[in-house]
Amino acid sequence: MKTLSQSLFEELDQIVLIDSHSHINPHSPASTDLSDLLGYHYYTELAHSSGMQRADIEEPNLPNREKVRRLFGFLGNIDNTVQWSWFVELARELLGFEGEVIDQSNWEIVYDLATTRMKENDWEEQVLSKSRVEKIFLTNDFDDPLTGFN
C-alpha cells in the first residue's frame, strides 16, 4: 500500500513544469560540461561559504576539469543542502551515475559521464523531456537582444 507521501509525489511528478525565472543563455540553453553546471551560482556560492576562495575557480584560462576538481575540494561541505541533493539526483537521472555519493574520490566518473551525455545531439531535448519542463521564461537584462530563439 502506498503512503500518502508516495501518492502525493506520484501526482506531483505528473505535472508539466514552467520555469518562470531562468538565467540560461537562450542561444545555448543546455550545459555543455560539468563545470558549466557546477559553475551556477547555487554551487559556487555554497562552495565559497564553505571556505573556497573566488580566485580558486575564476583564474584566467583555468581548464574546466580543473575548475570542477577545485570545486569538489569544498562541495563535500554542502552535502546537507537541498542544492546538493538536486545535483546528486540530476547526476543519477540525467547522466546515468549509479552511486549514492559524489565526492573527491569519484567526481571524475560524473565528469566523464557528463562530458559524454552533454555532447549528444539531443541533450537539450533529453533534459526537457525528463524534467517535464514545457516552457522557460528568461530573466534578461533590459538591453538584451531578444532575437534568435523561441
Question: At which residue positions do the language-model features occur?
Answer:
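Metal-cofactor-binding active-site regions of metalloenzymes
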Residues: 2-150
